[in-house]
């Protein structure tokens, strides 16, 4: 399929050790490859292995993650690193079953680590792979459904286990599928079909369904919160507070704020006479 024709250069592919693959895959969730590269380099320099990550204080690993967002990702990385140290002697396991027991690792990440780092014949099905396979097969199933993802994983698993005896290299196959979806079989009805190695037998193209496949239900609308924020200064210092350990932006620091939009007079009155009930002091 021409698996190396459109592989992007990335630091985690130069030396696909399990730790590098793991960190990169978690960083790449909800984040573009080019945006991840400098954060990956900084993180690896500071925390080059599982042992260093497991021993890292929270404030430090949160600071290293600063700018990537979705901070639960790095909290889960730290918790999983502690698991690996305690249960596996610091060695990242090489089977999907064991990887799935680690905090924050789902079926895609487990498949990516097992196949890319250890060359195990297991699939790594992300959004790109779902799109590619759905189009090649003209499958109009809703890819947002877990049952559809699971069925695709089972089909790819069976195929890979068979084809590995015919020379299929799992790490290259999975990376090629990911790259095909990211660079050629792109979303939003604008794929580069003429560049695709599967051009001749892509059923969605042959049936003129490229614009309608894959089928994907809309995500829930974002909840919007309205708050009044207080920037309280004392010389060069600004007052901050730490958010609760659970919930939205758990454990991060924020400017003091209260629910709702207050007029200037209301805000000034609240600032000069705060009470625990209004939330400014909590």
Go through the PLM ranges and name each one.
Residues 8-192, 198-207:
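Catalytic cores of DNA base-excision repair glycosylases
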Residues 251-273, 277, 282:
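The catalytic Nudix box helix
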Residues 1-9, 271-276:
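Conserved small/polar residues in nucleotide/adenosyl-binding loops
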Residues 15-16, 222, 247, 273:
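A short beta-turn/loop motif at secondary-structure boundaries
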């Amino acid at each position: 399929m021409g698996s190396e024709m459109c592989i992007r250069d990335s630091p985690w592919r130069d030396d696909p050790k399990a730790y590098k693959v793991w960190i990169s895959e978690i960083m790449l969730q909800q984040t573009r490859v080019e945006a991840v590269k400098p954060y990956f380099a900084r993180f690896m320099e500071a925390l080059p292995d599982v042992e260093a990550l497991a021993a890292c204080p929270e404030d430090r690993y949160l600071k290293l993650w600063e700018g990537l967002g979705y901070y639960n990702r790095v909290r889960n990385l730290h918790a999983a690193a502690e698991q690996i140290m305690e249960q596996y002697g610091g060695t990242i396991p090489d089977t999907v079953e064991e990887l799935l027991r680690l905090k924050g690792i789902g079926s895609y990440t487990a498949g990516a680590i097992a196949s890319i780092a250890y060359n195990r014949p297991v699939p790594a099905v992300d959004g790109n792979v779902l799109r590619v396979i759905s189009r090649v097969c003209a499958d109009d199933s809703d890819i947002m459904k877990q049952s559809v993802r699971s069925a695709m994983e089972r089909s790819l698993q069976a195929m890979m286990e068979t084809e590995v005896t015919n020379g299929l290299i799992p790490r290259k196959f999975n990376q090629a599928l990911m790259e095909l979806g990211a660079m050629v079989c792109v979303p939003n009805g604008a794929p580069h079909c003429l560049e695709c190695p599967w051009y001749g037998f892509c059923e969605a193209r042959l049936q003129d369904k490229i614009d309608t496949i894959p089928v994907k239900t809309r995500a829930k609308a974002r909840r919007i919160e309205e708050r009044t924020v207080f920037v309280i200064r004392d010389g060069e210092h600004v007052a901050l507070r730490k958010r609760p350990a659970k919930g939205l932006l758990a454990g991060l620091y924020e400017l003091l704020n209260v629910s709702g939009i207050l007029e200037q007079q209301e805000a000034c009155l609240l600032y000069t006479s705060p009470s625990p009930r209004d939330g400014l002091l909590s």
